[in-house]
Curated annotation (Swiss-Prot):
Acylphosphatase-like domain ranges (all copies): 3-90
Keyword annotations from UniProtKB, A to Z: Hydrolase
Database matches in NCBIfam families: PRK14426.1, PRK14448.1
Family named by the database record: Belongs to the acylphosphatase family.
Protein name: Acylphosphatase
Catalysis performed (reactions): an acyl phosphate + H2O = a carboxylate + phosphate + H(+)
E.C. number(s) listed in UniProt: 3.6.1.7
Enzyme class: hydrolase
Transmembrane segments: none
GO molecular function: acylphosphatase activity
Underlying gene: acyP
Taxonomic superkingdom: Bacteria
Ranges in a coiled coil: none
Length: 90
């Protein structure tokens, strides 16, 4: 399993982005979390197969119709923490 961190920029807070990301992640079957960041972006950490993470990345570039995604930065996530589900963090 691979671990990735995605930082999503644009109009992504206050538009249901975390909820829809959670719902999509559950459908895809990845584990990890989504949370708002202080700079107005959204952080997503996900653990899954190459295919699952590619599906999530594709969805993040579009987001829900209430959002306006400008950029998604993807990088390896080196933290050794294990995840048992996908959660919304506050």
């Amino acid at each position: 399993m691979l671990k990735k961190q995605f930082i999503v920029y644009g109009l992504v807070q206050g538009v249901g982005f975390r909820y829809f990301t959670w719902k999509t992640a559950m459908q895809i079957g990845v584990k990890g979390y989504v949370r708002n960041r202080d700079d107005g972006s959204v952080e997503v950490v996900a653990v899954g197969s190459t295919t699952q993470l590619a599906q999530l990345h594709t969805w993040l570039t579009q987001g829900p119709r209430t959002a306006s995604v400008e950029q998604v930065i993807e990088q390896e996530y080196a933290d050794s923490r294990e995840f048992t589900d996908f959660s919304v963090r506050y």
